[in-house]
């Protein structure tokens, strides 16, 4: 795989995790 492909896969994997963490922290604080 090229560096671009690795970066794309990491971004696709990380974005949902970050969104879930932000949503969870927002719900926990409310």
UniProtKB/Swiss-Prot annotation:
* Predominant place of localization: membrane
Q: Does the keyword Transmembrane apply?
A: yes
Example GO biological process? photosynthesis
* Coiled coil ranges: none
Which Pfam family is an annotated match for this chain, by its short name?
PsaM
- What does the UniProt entry say about where the protein is found? Cellular thylakoid membrane
Alphabetically sorted, this entry's keywords are: Membrane, Photosynthesis, Photosystem I, Thylakoid, Transmembrane, Transmembrane helix
The record ties this protein, via InterPro entries, to: PSI_PsaM, PSI_PsaM_sf
Gene Ontology CC terms? photosystem I; plasma membrane-derived thylakoid membrane
**What is its membrane topology?**
Single-pass membrane protein
Q: Where are the transmembrane segments?
A: 6-26
Family matches, as SUPFAM superfamilies: Subunit XII of photosystem I reaction centre, PsaM
Question: In which family does this protein belong, per the annotation?
Answer: Belongs to the PsaM family.
* UniProt xrefs under HAMAP family: PSI_PsaM
Name of this protein: Photosystem I reaction center subunit XII
Q: Give the source lineage, highest ranks first.
A: Bacteria, Bacillati, Cyanobacteriota, Cyanophyceae, Synechococcales
Q: Which gene encodes it?
A: psaM
């Amino acid at each position: 795989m090229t560096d671009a492909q690795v970066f794309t896969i990491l971004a696709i994997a990380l974005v949902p995790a970050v969104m879930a963490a932000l949503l969870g922290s927002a719900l926990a604080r409310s």
